[in-house]
């Protein structure tokens, strides 16, 4: 009998996404004592929430069919030549950066560099980014990116509030020349904090003594280049701080903010090689004075040394961050925009100071030629000085001119019914300028002579604001200008790191799963990448279809009634969700409801976000099994009944189990007038099995960069949409270009829109059946690891059935007591085995939290378990005295190649150090540095590129 031939390709992608083969799956189930994956699911999911998920989704499509489907959607977007500007510009992504970085899984599948020894490549690139920002802004300390320019402005506002000596003030000045989307996000952030944002023309500003800070745009949104020096002095005299939103390309030619007194500079690095992407993702920047460094938001790369004294990089001053300081953190930011910051960094490396300056001069000269030509046509720019943007008083011709431009497939900025705006960029050419003259010319007018104007038009930058200081003098910006050199530099950096292209990354709570190539392909299509977020709606019908379909898919997966795709990180999704709850209570006259209950096990973003949303945090206890202590919750809910706003709870719990009492918890909160926020960080265990919107949740955020396959990018981008029940739908984030105008949490209507195709592709190829199997296999893989390792390390928490959800926590505290070996020692020793460490000391100090995801094969799971078992044997050798308690492979891990070929004085062999298991002989990862000295790095903070001599020593 011949085998039956399968004539359909539906659902074929499921087996590509899921790691274990059928035989492996059965063997793993038998290890756990189950005969089917359904039986395991039935045992793990609590009875009270079974049947809450009904995935009403079509069958999965093949990769080829899904790509054809999304290509048809993308083709509905119309790509006009765009001069809208307003913080978003066309740009050329250099091909070697596109191919070797953006499309390279060695870069886009990496995790945030909390483990510095295996992250030196992207840390170096981020240090280059920080140096770029510091140089261009004239301020000594810059962070490693924020989410977008508007949210960076909001961070600057709260930064000024913390540091201003004008402590009694609740007023923040924002220039009316700032980008409109920035002003909207400022208002959203300010309201829960009791801050009043005063928007006015700085030229009409009188007394400034009532302000704690100010935000100025440089150049202004309308194109003007203002001299802010006197204004900055006035604010400083009133004990206020000044933030400047500055265009990076313009800063190659203009006096940097730090040199005219600004305390903070913020902005976007988008025009440094990152496509428009219908609004994102793009890396924002934040730089400030050295005295303020410990109050900066976001991550900061610093220079330190390893245990051998060799230069090494690391994330510095982490005590500022939400995962440590919780509600007292400087910000709730977790995910940033590392991948996009690295693109901008390499754009600067590739072009160098001369190349960037030449681009800026070309853009400015073309703008000056355009303005002069328009002047001869009777349209004089309103700006005396400008860099790349013009405002034209077009009067009664405005509508006709706009229509004429549209007819030529050109978008102009519609300022009002009397004015049009134009912003040029590095893609603008002579022919583009001449086409604009044709549009603006009246019938019978002779067009200007481009060549003649090019020879005679002077600069329109103010002489008093021309940049005098040098930029990008460090060798890294002056070496890699040929494609060959840049390609090899990118390869050298990538080889220093561990990402998913080399190994499993078993980080608990982080869901480091497959980012399939077919999901990634549409991201770099021009139809998705080259659309301005403020283009007319009829030009973005493809995006509208994509977002409508994706919202419906996510509603089906979560059980919620409505979805907002605007938040561009999980932390921002949390914020949007709590703002929706806050607005809901206010709409009912319950403004006094401001208590947010948060379990003690919660991720640090939860209390930090509640604080940002104007809520007071009350912590509830957890019991010995890691579950929410329901009696403590009940008591505190009753105690705060009249002020209760919400509870924030993660499900499955942060401890890696499905809590049996989740419905009861939701009921207690609802009965006392509160709303239930279910943190969707662990949604990877629930899709197709149970739905938060059906078992008591009122709102959840989802991490598309976890459950739904958007890559982590080394620390961003992420997308954190929120799902809500119908009563909260009117309070989801709005935008000036949407039906609801208020409540924007980021600059663009759909946030990081250009990476939404990744999630659409994943869901479309998996279908309902595949999504359910992904959850089931994630649970199977976690329980398999738990079972294999429980004889060697105590599994700290399990459900009532002795099973975990999609992750498990190993308790290393007894090992620390018996041997002196710490969780850090085990994490660093795993590097010698070629693994990224699991999550360390969260949610319990002295533990490792392991999440394998469904994408890892049994072979890889066994390789990890074998490594952990081998490490336990080494620990036993320390315990029984066979290995020295201080000089052993764990305390000295990780071991570098340089160390192995150098003088060897350890009481264990070189072979034991670097080849503890035979499989490493054919495939060995060599860390570029030894264990990094964290204390040295914070005590001797250096956050810009060190000298070339130190690179040579490295």
Swiss-Prot record:
One of its GO terms (biological process) is glycine decarboxylation via glycine cleavage system. GO terms for cellular component: cytosol; glycine cleavage complex. The modification N6-(pyridoxal phosphate)lysine is found at residue 706. Signal peptide: none annotated. The keyword Protein transport does not apply. Its EC number is 1.4.4.2. Gene3D superfamilies: Aspartate Aminotransferase, domain 1, Type I PLP-dependent aspartate aminotransferase-like (Major domain). It comes from the Bacteria. Its cofactor is pyridoxal 5'-phosphate. Pfam families: GcvP2_C, GDC-P. Keywords: Oxidoreductase, Pyridoxal phosphate. It catalyses: N(6)-[(R)-lipoyl]-L-lysyl-[glycine-cleavage complex H protein] + glycine + H(+) = N(6)-[(R)-S(8)-aminomethyldihydrolipoyl]-L-lysyl-[glycine-cleavage complex H protein] + CO2. One of its GO terms (molecular function) is glycine binding. It is an enzyme of class 1 (oxidoreductase). The glycine cleavage system catalyzes the degradation of glycine. The P protein binds the alpha-amino group of glycine through its pyridoxal phosphate cofactor; CO(2) is released and the remaining methylamine moiety is then transferred to the lipoamide cofactor of the H protein. Belongs to the GcvP family. The glycine cleavage system is composed of four proteins: P, T, L and H. PANTHER family: GLYCINE DEHYDROGENASE (DECARBOXYLATING), MITOCHONDRIAL (PTHR11773:SF1), GLYCINE DEHYDROGENASE, DECARBOXYLATING (PTHR11773). This is Glycine dehydrogenase (decarboxylating).
């Amino acid at each position: 009998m011949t085998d039956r031939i399968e004539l359909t390709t539906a659902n074929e992608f499921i087996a590509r996404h899921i790691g274990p083969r059928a035989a492996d799956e059965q063997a793993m189930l038998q290890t756990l004592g189950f005969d089917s994956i359904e039986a395991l699911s039935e045992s793990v999911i609590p009875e009270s929430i079974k049947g809450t998920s009904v995935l009403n989704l079509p069958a999965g499509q093949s990769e080829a069919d899904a790509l054809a489907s999304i290509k048809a959607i993308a083709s509905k977007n119309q790509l006009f030549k765009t001069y809208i500007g307003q913080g978003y510009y066309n740009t050329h992504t250099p091909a070697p950066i596109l191919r070797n970085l953006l499309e390279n899984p060695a870069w886009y599948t990496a995790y945030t560099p909390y483990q510095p020894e295996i992250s030196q490549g992207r840390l170096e690139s981020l240090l280059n980014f920080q140096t770029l920002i510091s140089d261009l802004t004239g301020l000594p300390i810059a962070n490693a990116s924020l989410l977008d320019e508007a949210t960076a402005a909001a961070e600057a506002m709260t930064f000024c509030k913390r540091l201003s000596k004008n402590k009694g003030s609740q007023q923040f000045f924002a220039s009316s020349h700032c980008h409109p989307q920035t002003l909207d996000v400022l208002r959203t952030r300010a309201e829960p904090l009791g801050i009043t944002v005063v928007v006015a023309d700085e030229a009409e500003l009188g007394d400034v003594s009532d302000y704690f800070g100010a935000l100025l745009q440089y150049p202004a949104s309308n194109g003007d280049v203002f001299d802010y020096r006197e204004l900055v002095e006035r604010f400083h005299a009133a004990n206020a701080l000044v933030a400047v939103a500055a265009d990076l390309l313009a800063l190659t030619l203009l006096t940097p903010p730090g040199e005219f007194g600004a305390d903070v500079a913020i902005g976007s690095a988008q025009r440094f090689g990152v496509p428009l992407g219908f609004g994102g993702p793009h890396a924002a920047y934040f730089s400030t004075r050295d005295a303020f460094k410990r109050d900066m938001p976001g991550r900061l790369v610093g220079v330190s040394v390893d245990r051998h004294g060799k230069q090494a990089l690391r994330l510095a001053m982490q005590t500022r961050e939400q995962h440590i300081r919780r509600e007292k953190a400087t910000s709730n930011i977790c995910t940033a925009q590392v991948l996009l910051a690295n693109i901008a960094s390499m754009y600067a490396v590739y072009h160098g100071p001369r190349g960037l300056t030449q681009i800026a001069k070309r853009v400015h000269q073309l703008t000056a030629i355009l303005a002069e030509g328009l002047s001869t046509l009777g349209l004089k720019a309103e700006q005396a000085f400008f860099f790349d943007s013009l405002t034209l008083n077009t009067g009664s011709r405005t509508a006709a001119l706009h229509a004429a431009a549209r007819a030529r497939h050109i978008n102009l900025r519609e300022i009002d019914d009397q004015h049009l705006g134009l912003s040029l960029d590095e893609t603008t050419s002579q022919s583009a300028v001449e086409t604009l003259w044709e549009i603006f010319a009246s019938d019978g007018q002779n067009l200007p002579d481009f060549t003649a104007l090019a020879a005679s038009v002077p600069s329109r930058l103010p002489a008093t604001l021309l940049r005098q200081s040098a930029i990008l003098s460090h060798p890294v910006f002056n070496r890699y200008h040929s494609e060959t050199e840049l390609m090899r530099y990118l390869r050298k950096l990538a080889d220093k790191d561990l990402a998913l292209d080399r190994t499993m990354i078993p980080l608990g709570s982080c869901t480091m799963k497959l980012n399939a190539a077919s999901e990634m392909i549409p991201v770099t299509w021009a139809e998705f990448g080259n659309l301005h977020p403020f283009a007319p709606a009829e030009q973005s019908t493809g995006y509208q279809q994509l977002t409508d379909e994706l919202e419906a898919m996510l509603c089906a997966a979560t059980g919620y009634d409505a979805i907002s795709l605007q938040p561009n990180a999980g932390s921002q999704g949390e914020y949007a969700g709590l703002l929706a709850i806050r607005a809901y209570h206010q709409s009912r006259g319950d403004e006094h409801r401001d208590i947010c209950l948060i379990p003690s096990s919660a991720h640090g973003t939860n209390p930090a976000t509640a604080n940002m949303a104007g809520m007071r945090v009350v912590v509830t206890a957890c019991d010995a099994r890691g579950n929410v202590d329901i009696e403590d919750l009940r008591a505190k809910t009753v105690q705060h009944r009249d002020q209760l706003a919400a509870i924030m709870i993660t499900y499955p719990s942060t401890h890696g189990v499905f809590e049996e009492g989740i419905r009861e918890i939701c009921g207690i909160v609802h009965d006392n007038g509160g709303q239930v926020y279910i943190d969707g960080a662990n949604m990877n265990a629930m899709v197709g099995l149970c739905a938060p919107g059906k078992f008591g949740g009122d709102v959840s955020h989802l991490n598309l960069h976890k459950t739904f396959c958007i890559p982590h990018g080394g620390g961003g981008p992420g997308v954190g949409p929120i799902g809500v029940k119908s009563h909260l739908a009117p309070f989801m984030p709005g935008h000036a270009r949407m039906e609801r105008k208020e409540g924007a949490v980021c600059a663009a209507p759909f946030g990081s829109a250009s990476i939404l195709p990744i999630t659409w592709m994943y869901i479309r190829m998996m279908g309902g059946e595949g999504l359910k199997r992904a959850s089931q296999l994630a649970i199977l893989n976690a329980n398999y690891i738990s079972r294999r390792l429980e004889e060697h390390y105590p599994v700290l928490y399990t459900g009532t059935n002795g099973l975990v959800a999609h992750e498990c926590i190993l308790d290393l505290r007894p090992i620390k007591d018996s041997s002196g070996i710490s969780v850090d020692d085990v994490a660093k020793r795993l590097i010698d085995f070629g693994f990224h460490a699991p999550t360390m000391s969260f949610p319990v100090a002295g533990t490792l939290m392991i999440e394998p995801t469904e994408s890892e094969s049994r072979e890889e799971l066994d390789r990890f378990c074998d490594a952990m078992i081998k490490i336990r044997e080494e620990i036993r050798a320390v315990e029984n005295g066979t290995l020295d308690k201080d000089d052993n492979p764990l305390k000295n891990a990780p071991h570098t190649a340089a160390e192995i070929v150098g003088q060897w004085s350890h009481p264990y062999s070189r072979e034991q150090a670097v080849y503890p298991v035979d499989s490493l002989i054919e495939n060995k990862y060599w860390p570029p540095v030894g264990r990094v000295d964290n204390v040295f790095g914070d005590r001797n903070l250096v956050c810009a590129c060190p000298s070339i001599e130190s690179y040579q020593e490295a």
